[in-house]
Amino acid sequence: MDLTIPKDYDPRLSIRETEAAIRYIRETFQDEFGKELNLQRMSAPMFVEKSTGLNDNLNGVEQPVSFEMKDMPNETVEIVHSLAKWKRLALKRYGFGMHEGLYTNMNAIRKEEDLDNFHSIYVDQWDWEKIISKDERTEETLKDTVRDIFKVIKHMEHEVWYKFPQAVYHLPDEIHFVTTQELEDRWPDLTPLEREDKIAKELGAVFVMKIGDKLQRSGKPHDGRAPDYDDWSLNGDIIFWYEPLQRRIEVSSMGIRVSPESMKYQLEQADATDREKLPFHKMLLNGELPYTIGGGIGQSRLCMLLLGKAHIGEVQASIWPEDMIKKCEENHIQIL
C-alpha cells in the first residue's frame, strides 16, 4: 500500500455533487468518444472461459479471479483483467467493416493490484477496438488516434467547467510523443516510472511509445505488456502531469494490435509460445482476424483527473485497507 496525501487538500465537491459529476463525465465522454472514433457501444462479458485464451494476461504473473460453474464443471471461468483480445474477436464475429469499431463498459477485478492513489482492485474502463488496414499499421496511424482521443479528453475539461466550474482540473493544450528508448537515453539512472514523472512534468501531456520490448541500455522492458495483443513497437500510454499529487497519471493504454508475425516474435520473447495452441492465437496466426487498433481508457482515472481528486476511491466504490481509509478521512479525502 502506498498513499500520497496532498497538502491542504480541498475536495471542492460534496460526495453527492461528486456522484453527479461522475455520471455527467461518463455519459458525455463515451458519446463524444464513440462519435470521434466511429465506435458502436456493445455488450461485453465480465468473465471468459480460461481455455479460450481470451483473458488479458497483463504482465504474465497476475492471477485472475476464477471459479467453476455448476452446469460447466469441467471449465474454469475467469473474471476478465481486460477485454483486449475479446474485442478483436468480437469485431470479426459481429461483422464490423473497415474503419468501424466498438467500445464497451468494461468492469474487471485485478486482485493482485498494489493499492495507491491511482490503483484499485476494481477496474472500470472504456475498452475499445477498431478495424484498420494492414497498410495503416504505422506510427502515424497510432499518433493520429492518440490526438483524436486527447481532443475528446481536452473538450471534456470545458464540459466539466461549464457544469462544475469550482472543481475542474485544467489540462495542457496539446499532447507530445516520446519513446521509451528516448527516456532511457535521457535518464538512464532513473526507473521507468521516475522517467515518466520527469517527462510528464516537463511537457504536461505525453504519449509514451513502444512499451514491452527490451531497451538497449538496460536490456529490460520499460514496463510489462502481454505479448498477444499490442504490437510492442506500435503502442503506448497516455499520461498527464498531475499537480495535486506531483506525479504522472496514466489515463489510457493503447496500441496497434499484433500481426501474425509480430505476435510470433513477441511470444518467443516472452517465452510464451505455448499460447499458440489456444483458439484465439490459432485464429490470429492463421490470418483469420482483422487488423486492429485498440485500448482502454480508465473511467475512474478520467473522472479523478478532470475533477482534481486526490484518490481514485473518491470516484469509485471499492475496498481499501482500514489505515488508508483513516488517513484519507483525516485529510478530507472522501472515500466512497
UniProtKB/Swiss-Prot annotation:
* BP-aspect Gene Ontology terms: L-asparagine biosynthetic process
ATP-binding listed as a keyword: yes
What molecular functions are annotated in GO for this chain? aspartate-ammonia ligase activity; ATP binding; catalytic activity, acting on a protein; transferase activity
Under catalytic activity, the entry for this protein gives: L-aspartate + NH4(+) + ATP = L-asparagine + AMP + diphosphate + H(+)
Q: What is its main location?
A: cytoplasm
The reply on keyword Nucleotide-binding is yes
What EC number(s) is this enzyme filed under?
6.3.1.1
Gene Ontology terms: cellular component: cytosol
Pathway it works in:
Amino-acid biosynthesis; L-asparagine biosynthesis; L-asparagine from L-aspartate (ammonia route): step 1/1
Annotated coiled-coil positions are: none
Family that this chain belongs to: Belongs to the class-II aminoacyl-tRNA synthetase family. AsnA subfamily.
* This protein's name: Aspartate--ammonia ligase
Q: Which organism is it from?
A: Limosilactobacillus reuteri (strain DSM 20016)
Report the gene name.
Answer: asnA
